[in-house]
């Protein structure tokens, strides 16, 4: 939309524009309109699993395994993993299974031959089929470890990964050192990411499968770069409101715009067995419309609201840059205060036909007294009556909520709230 202003001195029109410095978001539905069918992945299928097992083992041990061998090994070892579909499985018009049919772990993919050069690996003696019980867990678990950003947490994850491997086979070995980083480059390989996503998508669908424990490593692929969606779900849970009621508490245009974009129809956001949660690793989208980066105002508003209604995890959410902090803070503050001053308590059962019903007029004509319901209209009327300036009780409420915050990280919602409300 173009914006035109008038220059007072001359009466001439001036076009007001900003530089287009951001790439547009890419929705999963648009991808499948342009690329109908299953996700394509390229795998080198020339080597047998016995040779690949040796290459992968020695490569992990020495820190020089080639991702092409990793992909081929995962494919060869897991391709026969199957389960029975309890219903038709369709996503974005792609038929993945029919009710009663047998579906395999990579049936979400269209497997094509890898045409690039595959270097030789290093062979070794003593590798057996028993290694196939734990090596895939180690490989997939390293993907999860590579996503960690804090060193202590990374080391902790690696130890937990080894425990998972030993559960699958007592012969599992700790091949990778704490300081190793060679496996982090696997995330640059689109074929590896697609295999990870396909594995997680399958075991999310078939949660009771004997090998569903492999999700320990792949689970971070699901809803990657969808932090804003997670924020929406979190706000709904911690406030106790329905999703519709949460929407009514959106008071800022910037939040409104971002939320409406996220709610674009026919994207299968609410379909659990869809391709959608894996839009990044499947290569469906390079700019997620559900990330905190693309929805900074909504993410900030939601996380600050959650923090002020006792959410411990919200304190570590990152504070976005270059957003209207003041108006977003006020909106989140009022929302949280309303939740803290009211409740959804009602009599839910009765022994006969009689039960307590609140007088509908109880909150009318309150003047400057805060409402006791969660009705946004009553709260906005009250907010207008008090001059749209936070009351002393609101300040006390916010100060009390941030008083006990400890172990606060830099540039987080916790730090922002502490500085804003503790004065």
Swiss-Prot record:
Function: Encapsidates the genome in a ratio of one N per nine ribonucleotides, protecting it from nucleases. The encapsidated genomic RNA is termed the NC and serves as template for transcription and replication. The nucleocapsid is bullet-shaped with the tip containing 8 turns of a conical spiral before reaching the helical cylindrical trunk. Nucleocapsid assembly is concomitant with replication, therefore viral replication depends on the intracellular concentration of free N, termed N(0). All replicative products are resistant to nucleases.
Subcellular location per the Swiss-Prot or TrEMBL entry: Virion; Host cytoplasm
Alphabetic keyword roster: Capsid protein, Helical capsid protein, Host cytoplasm, Ribonucleoprotein, RNA-binding, Viral nucleoprotein, Virion
Principal subcellular localisation of the protein: virion
Organism for this UniProt entry: Isfahan virus
Family the entry assigns: Belongs to the vesiculovirus nucleocapsid protein family.
Gene3D superfamilies: Nucleoprotein, Rhabdovirus nucleocapsid protein like domain
Segments of this protein annotated with the region Interaction with the phosphoprotein: 351-391
Name of the protein described by the UniProt record: Nucleoprotein
GO cellular component: helical viral capsid; host cell cytoplasm; ribonucleoprotein complex; viral nucleocapsid
Gene: N
Positions contributing to RNA binding: 144, 153, 207, 215, 287, 318, 409
Lineage: Viruses, Riboviria, Orthornavirae, Negarnaviricota, Haploviricotina
Subunit architecture: Homomultimerizes to form the nucleocapsid. Binds to viral genomic RNA; this interaction contributes to the virion assembly. N in the nucleocapsid interacts (via C-terminus) with the P protein (via C-terminus); this interaction allows to package the L polymerase in the virion and positions the polymerase on the template, since P acts as a bridge between N and L. N(0) interacts with the P protein; this interaction prevents the uncontrolled aggregation of N(0). Interacts with the matrix protein (inner layer); this interaction contributes to the virion assembly. Interacts with the L polymerase.
Source superkingdom: Viruses
GO MF: RNA binding
Keyword match Ribonucleoprotein: yes
